[in-house]
Amino acid sequence: TIGQAGIDKVKQVSMWHNNLEGELNESLTLGYRERFPEANDDFFFLSLLHGMELLQGAINTTQSTDPFEIALALEKGSYQGPTGKVWMRKDNHQLLQPLFVSTMVDINDGSIKYDVERTGIGFLTDSTTEADQTIIKTTCSMDRPDS
């Protein structure tokens, strides 16, 4: 473990961390901690929420559970997630979402509200890259079924 040695040195690029601003982000952190009070871990993979929200939107749009119809609807779908706009890229089916660069800090310095895994250390956002700024040319040559 890195622990205290990583304070103000360790950086991460992530899709989410538990000190992002916003009511929904805070409710994700608190909801997880309330549901699993004995666990020394935290909600982390926001992409799971994104996937379910996009799938629900595709099913609602198509009024179907047909995989092909849902796949086509997913390619057109988007939603406003807790960190910003999220959507699936049509040409390679990759999830596009904001990314955050953050620095490991000591919770006692007052710059963050929540630590990670109850360690007394957490992450403070340095910068945000919106989803549309992450798009690069794809080399994907996905072979799609006709139906």
Language model feature labels by segment:
Residues 1-147:
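Extracytosolic ligand-binding ectodomains
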